């Protein structure tokens, strides 16, 4: 079906990409991201640098790509600018050293910002596909992300045609791109599993300048679901949701869940699946990770909408081998739809995300260690946290064997404000912040979520801090952080 396209090796295709090009990669997490071109671009960068020639690209993605891909590009000094999210230790180091400019963005907003030209033109899009048609139809793979927008906006398109993916993966896709304001219609999704688009992206076939054939799996996440800390946090989340059901604040049929990525979220989903009182439920999320596949198999999750399948190769193969079952139970959408505030609010999504630190008034820091060093980025947590029916943030109460408290007097960086964070949960307990004044919130967070070794300090801070509606001692508000920098421990 795609025989008219020019076949190239990855190294040949990388020659198309020039110094300072804006390059856009498909995918959302490692799912659906290019597998061959990142290494080829890094090789080209190394060759150019050895010849004393400049060569760096500006790189747009959906969310993260595989850490290995970002690492190889970072090691080759091949990236000068990056947005909107990353999980690579090598790239993170370059960002925090100031060697790479990084723009941290709400994931739902990236496509619109590109459409309005805020970042300039996309010179080359590198898109993983499962199939092509001569008329320019492109079928995507296990992660949709911003690929539809990249395909439409890019001047040139390089396709990685990945034969690893079952062609039926296209049955999971639901591709729709909202119009531009002020003539943007509502997105007619009234149920988590509603389909409103097509299974492919239609583009001008003349833009496809190369096809690189691959047969490579996604780099799946390895998660430790047996972590006792994660299990206790998960138990507390389930306890809270059961209480909400008992009080009639969650209906008997439950509400759609959004769950972020990582060990805590994976443990929460597993615990929800094990609890007999929690009814079968839907997901309206940005990623589907490992535990979701099992819950779809058992029927505990009756349907799941997301932008990607961030799962192991074994679980992805299980889905491909049982598409007659899974095709009606999974929908993959562009991230401006999976993370769309309008839909999140309409469906009454319960958002479950992890933070780095919280302050005693309920602000949350998801991105910057000690307020300065980027970890990964805000990702989609803000899209859901600001618009969900219930915004729940989770974290261990301490890190590094107690040297760091997750609960502090004032966050060193704020991604999510007190006006949106509804519930904070650690392994210590649950802080329901709804309807509480600032001082009530502070005492609730300290008593229920802070680790016992830090509670006395936090209570003393609150009692001694001057103020009116909110109490803060600006002379000592960051003493814990200063101690950490000076001694390696917040308590000094």
UniProtKB/Swiss-Prot annotation:
GO MF entries: acetate CoA-transferase activity; acetyl-CoA hydrolase activity; propionyl-CoA:succinate CoA-transferase activity
Reactions listed under catalytic activity: propanoyl-CoA + succinate = propanoate + succinyl-CoA
Residues at which CoA binds: 260-264, 376, 380
Pfam families: AcetylCoA_hyd_C (PF13336), AcetylCoA_hydro (PF02550)
InterPro entries registered for this protein in UniProt: AcetylCoA_hyd_C (IPR026888), AcetylCoA_hyd_C_sf (IPR038460), ActCoA_hydro (IPR046433), ActCoA_hydro_N (IPR003702), NagB/RpiA_transferase-like (IPR037171), Succinate_CoA_transferase (IPR017821)
Gene3D superfamilies recorded: Acetyl-CoA hydrolase/transferase C-terminal domain, Glutaconate Coenzyme A-transferase
Entry keywords, A to Z: Transferase
EC number in record: 2.8.3.27
Catalytic residues, chain numbering: 286 (5-glutamyl coenzyme a thioester intermediate)
Domain of life: Bacteria
Enzyme class: transferase
GO process terms (BP): acetate metabolic process; acetyl-CoA metabolic process
Described function: Catalyzes the transfer of coenzyme A from propionyl-CoA to succinate. Could be part of a pathway that converts succinate to propionate.
Family the UniProt entry places it in: Belongs to the acetyl-CoA hydrolase/transferase family.
Name of this protein: Propanoyl-CoA:succinate CoA transferase
Protein source organism: Escherichia coli (strain K12)
Taxonomic lineage from the root: Bacteria, Pseudomonadati, Pseudomonadota, Gammaproteobacteria, Enterobacterales
């Amino acid at each position: 079906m795609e025989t008219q396209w020019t076949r190239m090796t990855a190294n040949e295709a990388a020659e198309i990409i020039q110094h300072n090009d804006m390059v856009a990669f498909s995918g959302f997490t490692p799912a659906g991201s290019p597998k061959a071109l990142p290494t080829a671009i890094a090789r080209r960068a190394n060759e150019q640098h050895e010849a004393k020639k400049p060569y760096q690209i500006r790189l747009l993605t959906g969310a993260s790509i595989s850490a290995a891909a970002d690492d190889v590009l970072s090691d080759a000094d091949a990236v000068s600018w990056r947005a909107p999210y990353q999980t690579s230790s090598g790239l993170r180091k370059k960002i925090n050293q100031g060697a790479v400019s990084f723009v941290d963005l709400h994931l739902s907003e990236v496509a619109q910002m590109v459409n309005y030209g805020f970042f300039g033109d996309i010179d080359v899009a590198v898109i993983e596909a499962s199939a092509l048609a001569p008329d320019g139809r492109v079928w995507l793979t296990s992660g949709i992300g911003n690929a539809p927008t990249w395909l439409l906006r890019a001047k040139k398109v390089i396709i990685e045609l990945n034969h690893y993916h079952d062609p039926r993966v296209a049955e999971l896709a639901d591709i729709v791109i909202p119009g531009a304001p002020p003539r943007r219609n509502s997105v007619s999704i009234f149920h988590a599993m509603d389909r409103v688009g097509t299974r492919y992206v239609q583009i001008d076939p003349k833009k496809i300048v190369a096809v690189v054939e691959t047969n490579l799996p996604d780099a799946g996440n390895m998660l430790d679901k047996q972590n006792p800390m994660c299990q206790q946090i998960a138990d507390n989340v389930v306890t809270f949701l059961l209480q909400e059901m008992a009080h009639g604040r969650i209906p008997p049929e439950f509400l759609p869940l959004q769950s972020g990525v990582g060990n805590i979220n994976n443990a929460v989903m597993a615990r929800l699946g094990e609890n007999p009182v929690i009814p079968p439920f839907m997901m309206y999320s940005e990623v589907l990770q490992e535990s979701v596949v099992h819950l779809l198999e058992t029927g505990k999750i009756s349907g799941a909408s997301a932008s990607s399948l961030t799962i192991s190769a074994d679980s992805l193969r299980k889905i491909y081998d049982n598409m007659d079952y899974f095709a009606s139970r999974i929908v993959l959408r562009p991230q401006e739809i999976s993370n769309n505030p309008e839909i999140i609010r309409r469906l009454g999504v319960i958002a479950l995300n992890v933070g780095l630190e919280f302050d005693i008034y309920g602000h949350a820091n998801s991105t910057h260690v000690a307020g300065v060093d980027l970890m990964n980025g805000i990702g989609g947590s803000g899209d859901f946290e600001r618009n969900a029916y219930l915004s729940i943030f989770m974290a261990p109460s301490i890190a590094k064997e107690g040297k760091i408290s997750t609960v502090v007097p004032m966050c060193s960086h704020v991604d999510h404000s007190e006006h949106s964070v509804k519930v904070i949960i650690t392994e210590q307990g649950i802080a329901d912040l709804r309807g509480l004044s600032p001082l009530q919130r502070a005492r609730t967070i300290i008593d229920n979520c802070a680790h016992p070794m830090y509670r006395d300090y936090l209570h003393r801070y609150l009692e001694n801090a001057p103020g009116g509606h909110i109490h803060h001692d600006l002379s000592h508000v960051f003493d814990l952080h200063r101690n950490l920098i000076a001694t390696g421990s917040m308590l000094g």
